[in-house]
């Protein structure tokens, strides 16, 4: 059992806490801020532009070498990785407290830049956490360490995506206090990080004479993929597969608020119960991919995750009720998780084992970068099409990927 292992190995407990801290900012950007803005009367077209902060998670691969090769002055006395973790967690605490002092109804400029800063600091924190985890554990225990980190990440998202909404409601929408408390959690986490043991490794310094070989190392995985048949077509299928779902997710929380659901209902049903539906759906998605080949599994889960968007059209016509939201979240999260599992499985299959890490990063970065960029305009589409028209549009967005997969299913034997 994962929980038993965590309590037996203190290193896993450290990774659990770091995972929790890693997951907290993402839920703030995805959910908490959008709910706050919606209740403050900010237009949906403006709310979704805050999603630009998510781009840091897609682009972090470009500054991750800095985390490997440069130390933070003074703070690195506690360790190379810990220096970056302490810096990021301290700054995130200050950013969150500053965010709570802003008034969205009066001015959005400062809050906008603070949100972008939070995304950048959070993604940088993630890089350092992953590096610390990989450094601390032996090869045979990397699996349990990764599972612990993911478990903690989910808890962190529940804290700021669920508990924070509930706390804001019971304090009469005192968002300043809510963000202050979250900021204090990050401040306390900074103290904890100082106590974490870091395994110091001998790191090779960058040499200018090795730049040519470094470029070759980076480019080779890309050349390997693009040499294969239908490479561009496959890449487009990966990019479009989750686009409709990403568009839907970007406006979901403001949509619930507009329908009249309370923050506590969103916290309990969408975040807490929704996590259970997601876990079950992910498991079933794995079975589907095992039972069918890659393309057929993707087509099945792709169709399911797109048609479940009709549930939101149905929800839009219902008076606010616990049961209606529960049904919608069950259907949507279950199918979306099936699609995510299928996509991860397919991407993993596509990777050449010789270049697995870089090629996997290529696919995930291409997909998330496209999704995070396009979803910025989701609010404008809602204003143009209305809620039901927007939901139909998200269903249509899934069609290119499905048509491409059907085509590839006939052409490629995988």
UniProtKB/Swiss-Prot annotation:
Listed PROSITE patterns: MFS (PS50850)
Protein name: Putative transporter AmpG 4
Sequence intervals crossing the membrane: 15-35, 44-64, 83-103, 109-129, 150-170, 176-196, 231-251, 268-288, 297-317, 324-344, 360-379, 385-405
Annotated membrane topology: Multi-pass membrane protein
Upper taxonomic lineage: Bacteria, Pseudomonadati, Pseudomonadota, Alphaproteobacteria, Rickettsiales
UniProt main location, coarse: membrane
Gene Ontology molecular function terms on file: transmembrane transporter activity
Keyword vocabulary terms for this entry: Cell inner membrane, Cell membrane, Membrane, Transmembrane, Transmembrane helix, Transport
Subcellular localization: Cell inner membrane
Family recorded in the similarity comment: Belongs to the major facilitator superfamily.
InterPro entries: AmpG_permease/AT-1, MFS, MFS_dom, MFS_trans_sf
One GO location term (cellular component): plasma membrane
Protein's organism: Rickettsia bellii (strain RML369-C)
SUPFAM superfamilies associated with the record: MFS general substrate transporter
């Amino acid at each position: 059992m994962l929980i038993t292992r965590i309590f037996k190995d203190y290193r896993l407990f450290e990774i659990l806490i770091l995972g929790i801290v890693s997951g907290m900012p993402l839920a703030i950007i995805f959910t908490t801020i959008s709910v706050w803005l919606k209740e403050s009367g900010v237009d949906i077209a403006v709310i979704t532009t805050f999603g630009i902060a998510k781009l840091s998670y897609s682009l972090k691969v470009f500054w991750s070498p800095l985390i490997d090769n440069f130390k933070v002055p003074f703070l690195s006395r506690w360790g190379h990785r810990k220096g970056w973790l302490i810096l990021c967690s301290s700054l995130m605490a200050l950013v969150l407290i500053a965010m709570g002092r802003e008034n969205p109804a009066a001015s959005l400029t400062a809050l906008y830049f603070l949100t972008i800063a939070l995304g950048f600091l959070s993604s940088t924190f993630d890089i350092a956490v992953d590096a610390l985890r990989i450094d601390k554990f032996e090869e045979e225990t990397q699996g349990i360490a990764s599972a612990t980190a993911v478990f903690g990440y989910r808890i962190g998202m529940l804290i700021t995506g669920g508990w924070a909404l509930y706390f804001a409601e019971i304090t009469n929408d005192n968002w300043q206090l809510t963000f202050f408390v979250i900021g204090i959690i990050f401040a306390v986490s900074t103290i904890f990080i100082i106590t974490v043991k870091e395994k110091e490794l001998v790191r090779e310094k960058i040499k200018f004479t090795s730049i040519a070989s470094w470029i070759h190392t980076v480019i080779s995985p890309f050349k390997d993929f693009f040499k294969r048949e239908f490479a561009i077509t496959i890449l487009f299928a990966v990019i479009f597969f989750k686009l409709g779902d990403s568009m839907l997710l970007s406006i979901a929380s403001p949509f619930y608020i507009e329908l009249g659901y309370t923050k506590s209902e969103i916290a309990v049903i969408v975040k807490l119960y929704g996590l259970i539906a997601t876990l079950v759906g992910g498991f079933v998605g794995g079975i589907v991919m095992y039972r069918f080949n890659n393309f057929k599994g993707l087509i099945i889960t792709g169709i399911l995750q797109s048609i479940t968007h009709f549930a939101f059209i149905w929800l839009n016509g219902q008076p606010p009720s616990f049961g209606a939201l529960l049904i919608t979240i069950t259907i949507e999260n279950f199918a979306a998780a099936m699609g995510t599992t299928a996509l991860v499985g397919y991407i993993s299959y596509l990777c050449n084992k010789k270049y697995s890490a870089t090629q996997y990063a290529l696919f995930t970065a291409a997909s998330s970068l496209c999704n995070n960029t396009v979803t910025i305009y989701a609010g404008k589409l809602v204003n143009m099409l209305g809620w039901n028209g927007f939901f139909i549009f998200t269903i249509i967005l899934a069609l290119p990927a499905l048509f491409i997969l059907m085509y590839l299913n006939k052409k490629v034997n995988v």
